[in-house]
Structure formats: C-alpha cells, structure tokens
From Swiss-Prot:
Keyword Transport: no
Name listed for the protein in its UniProt record: GTP cyclohydrolase 1
Classification via InterPro entries: GTP-CH-I_C/QueF, GTP-CH-I_N, GTP_CycHdrlase_I, GTP_CycHdrlase_I_CS, GTP_CycHdrlase_I_dom
Gene: folE
Organism: Corynebacterium aurimucosum (strain ATCC 700975 / DSM 44827 / CIP 107346 / CN-1)
Pathway annotation from the record: Cofactor biosynthesis; 7,8-dihydroneopterin triphosphate biosynthesis; 7,8-dihydroneopterin triphosphate from GTP: step 1/1
Recorded catalytic activity of this chain's protein: GTP + H2O = 7,8-dihydroneopterin 3'-triphosphate + formate + H(+)
One CC-aspect GO term: cytoplasm
Molecular function via GO: GTP binding; GTP cyclohydrolase I activity; zinc ion binding
Listed Gene3D superfamilies: 1.10.286.10, 3.30.1130.10
PANTHER family, alphabetized: GTP CYCLOHYDROLASE 1 (PTHR11109:SF7), GTP CYCLOHYDROLASE I (PTHR11109)
Alphabetic keyword roster: GTP-binding, Hydrolase, Metal-binding, Nucleotide-binding, One-carbon metabolism, Zinc
Length: 196
C-alpha cells in the first residue's frame, strides 16, 4: 500500500506513560497529585486505541469480498470519523462518504468494511487530505474498484480551540479515482447523492 508511513513498531505503553508524565511536568503540573496520578497510564491506554490504525493493513480490512456481479455504485454516507491532527495532536472529527464502482469481476466488500477502512486510516496521526486519499487508494489497490469517490467533512479542534479560534468551521476534502475522475457527469451524480 502507498501509505507513506515508516515501518511499524508496536505501541510502547511504558514510554508513552513516561512521556505524558514529562508533559505534565513541562506545563507546570504535579503528576503525583491525586487527580493526575493515573493520568499517564490512562492517556497511554487511550493513545493505544486512538492510534491503533498504525498497526493495521487495509488488505486485512477489505480481504472478504462477495461475488455479486454488481457493476453499479455502492455508496455509504455519513460515516462518523474521529482522527488526530498530526501537527498539534488534537482531534478532528466529522463524516466520511465513500462510494465505489466494483472492479470488472463484480466483487463487492461488506458495507461495514468501508466504515472500518475509514476508521483504520483515521486512527493514526493524520491530516485530512492524506486520510481522504488513503481511503480512495486502498479501494483501488485492494478491491480493484473501477471508480472511487471519497468526501470527508471535518471540524478541526486545532482551528477551534487554539490559533485562529474558529469553532464550527469545517474542512471538506475529496479524492476521486478512475471513472469518476474522468467523467464529470458521473462525478456530479455521485456528489448529488452524497448531498441528498
């Protein structure tokens, strides 16, 4: 896969706990006070879950297909996604819309697999643009989809709670592959279904 990420290491709970403890000290907190005593361990457990996608492969998610001889659009809309901005390590969240036309063999994947694929890539330090492209590319590379469209709409807390402080602003990204990229009418039809 073209994930452009370095070789994977297992999550190091001990190191993560130590880092959170040091961060608390760096911001002027006492990590030994009652309310924070368990925080390094809790944050390490949370990050193990939040970044679990680093240790997953899209072929594992999309390996099961069904021979339906379906050559028309499959679209799953309004998939909730939660990710972490790699620049500030704060959340961004919103919805993903994933559509594809199966490959010439007509094989489709389970609908839940599209949501799992979005989750897998979202559970990494991310930028929304890459997240959108990774989902689209996986559908082409693993499922051999003829056409793919992925649209993601998110609010970024790095824009809402710091810096420019614009809560409610949303960012929309899209990735279009295959026939949808070449055929403006087909692309417009899918976009109208996403917006309906």
């Amino acid at each position: 896969m073209s994930d452009n990420i370095p070789a994977q290491r297992e999550f190091d709970h001990e190191r993560a706990e130590a880092a959170v403890r040091e961060l608390l000290i760096a911001v002027g907190e006492d990590p030994d006070r009652e309310g924070l005593r368990e925080t390094p361990a809790r944050v390490a457990r949370a990050y193990a879950e939040v970044f679990a996608g680093l240790h997953q492969d899209p072929t594992e998610v999309l390996h099961k297909t069904f021979a339906e001889e379906h050559q028309e659009l499959v679209l799953v809309r309004d998939i909730p996604i939660y990710s972490t901005c790699e620049h500030h390590l704060v959340p961004f969240y919103g919805t993903a819309h994933i559509g594809y036309i199966p490959g010439t063999d007509g094989h489709v994947t389970g609908l839940s697999k599209l949501a799992r694929l979005a989750d897998m890539y979202a559970k990494r330090p991310q930028v929304q643009e890459r997240l959108t492209s990774q989902i689209a590319d996986a559908l082409v590379e693993v499922l051999h989809a003829q056409s793919v469209i992925v649209v993601i709409e998110c609010e970024h807390l790095c824009m809402a709670m710091r810096g420019i402080r614009k809560p409610g602003a949303t960012t929309t990204t899209s990735a279009v592959r295959g026939g949808f990229k070449k055929n403006a009418a087909s692309r417009a039809e899918v976009m109208s279904l996403i917006r309906s």
